[in-house]
Amino acid sequence: MKFLVSLVIFSLFLNGFATAQTLIQDSCKKAFAKDPQLSYDFCVNSLTQDPQSKAATTLESLVLASTKTAAAKITNLKGIVAQDLKDQRYQDIVEDLKLCLGFYNDANDDLTTALANIKSRDYQGANINLSAALDVPGNCEDDFKEAKKTSPITNENSILFKTILIPLAFTNML
């Protein structure tokens, strides 16, 4: 009898995991079909590594989880830039880094507003705020290019762009 109960519980757990995995894969596939800028592999990999995304049962909950992930990436990147500002190797690009830090603060505000939009089912508002946040990594990199300087955070900005693109693409599917 205990074996049967254990088997039923295991199969329910496995089914729940499979459902979340299917939601992630299907959502990433549909989003990629609509927006080729989105990397299908990056989408699936980043969402399957996130516990909130893995627990999502609807596209809306996946949008919330992926937006929170993007906000966490910005917070992490702000920490990296704060460390770079203290590093003597980057003293010739302090102003550029400060400008990027300001951009990240704006993006953080945009994502906070987008989360509120999503929770209230204002997907158009969420789209506007996610789009504004999506511009930030490029704006930061553009500043370095215009100044003919090398950005020490190009890779991080690329990852941030891809990360923000996920909830934006999903919001367009709601």
Curated annotation (Swiss-Prot):
Glycans are attached at residue 129. Keywords: Apoplast, Disulfide bond, Glycoprotein, Secreted, Signal. It comes from the Eukaryota. Induction: Induced in leaves during infection by Botrytis cinerea. GO terms for cellular component: apoplast. It is found in: Secreted, Extracellular space, Apoplast. GO terms for biological process: embryo development ending in seed dormancy; plant-type cell wall organization or biogenesis. Residues 1-20 form the signal peptide. InterPro entries: Invertase/methylesterase_inhib (IPR035513), Pectinesterase_inhib_dom (IPR006501), Pla_a_1-like (IPR034088). Disulfide bonds join 28-43, 100-140. Disruption phenotype: No visible phenotype under normal growth conditions, but mutant plants have enhanced susceptibility to infection by the necrotrophic pathogen Botrytis cinerea. GO terms for molecular function: pectinesterase inhibitor activity. Belongs to the PMEI family. Pectin methylesterase (PME) inhibitor involved in the maintenance of cell wall integrity in response to necrotrophic pathogens. Modulates PME activity and pectin methylesterification during infection by Botrytis cinerea and contributes to resistance against the pathogen. NCBIfam families: PME_inhib. PANTHER family: OS02G0537100 PROTEIN, PECTINESTERASE INHIBITOR 12. This is Pectinesterase inhibitor 12.
